[in-house]
Amino acid sequence: MTNPATSIASIQADHAVKLLAPLTDLVIKAGEAILAVSRKSLQVQGKADGSPVTEADLAADRIISEGLARIDPAIPVVSEERAEQSQPPFSGSFFLIDPLDGTKEFIAGRGEFTVNLALVSEGIPLLGIVSAPAIGLLWRGVVGRGADRRAIKGAGAEAPTPIRTRPLPIRGLPWNAAVSRSHGDPATEAFIASRPGAVRKMLGSAVKFCRVAEGDADIYPRLSPTCEWDIAAGHAVLTAAGGRVTDSKGAEIRFGQARPDFIIPEFIAWGDPTAIP
C-alpha cells in the first residue's frame, strides 16, 4: 500500500494558524465526549503493549478522526488508537493525536488527563493543542507565532491568555521539575538528583509540558521510552512558548521517522533553552 503522506506538501505557520480555531473546537468536543463517559460503568481493556484503553479513548478518537477528515482531508492522521494502520516514515505534514493521554489518570478519577493534537511538518511539531477537560484548561501554540492558555469550562469561558516560559533560576535557588505521577524511572530520578535544589511537581499526561510552557515549572525530563503521540502536541506548545525539547544530549527529536511503534527513547523539555548542554 502506498503511504499517502509522501505526496503531502509541508504545511507552514500561516496555514497552521488558520487551522488553529477549528482544531481547537474539535479538541474541546472530544474532551466533552470523554467527560460524558461514566466511570461507574467504565470498561477497561488492555492493548497489545499492556496499556489500558476505554470507551472514552475510542469515543474521542472517533470524534477527532471524523473532524479532521472534514477540516483538511488531505492531511494524513496518525492516532494512538489506530497506529497499526500508519506507515511511516512521513514526509511533508501529518496530524498526530492521542485522544486520551493519561488513561490511567482518567480511570483513577484524577483530572490530569488530556486530549492531544499536533500537526507535524517535516518531522517537527508545528502546531499543538493540549486540552485538560476535567480541569477546564486548554493550551495551544503554533511555533513562531506564540502560545496561549484558555479556560474551557462554563458558558462563555475566557479569552486566550498568552503564555511564555521563564528563565531557569540562578544556581543555588530552587527550581521546579515536572515529573510523571505514573511513570517514574531511575534515569530520570538520577538526572534530577544531579541538579540540586529541585522541587518536584507530580503531574499527569501532557499537562507537564504545559506547566513548563506557562512558566509554572522549569523542566520536564523523561529518560525512559514513550510514544510520539504522547509528546508531539506538548512539544509544539512548549516550543511556541519559548522552550525546546531535546534528547539528553541536546539533539533535536524528529517525528514520523519510522521508529518501531513510534517510540521516543527519551526527551527533556526545557523552559529555558540556554540551559541545554
Each PLM stretch: what is its role?
Residues 1-25, 32, 190-193, 209-277:
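Oxyanion/phosphate-interacting regions
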Residues 3, 117-210, 258-277:
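Acidic beta-strand-loop-alpha-helix segment within the catalytic core
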Residues 34, 57, 68, 103, ...:
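Residue-level signal for inorganic ion chemistry
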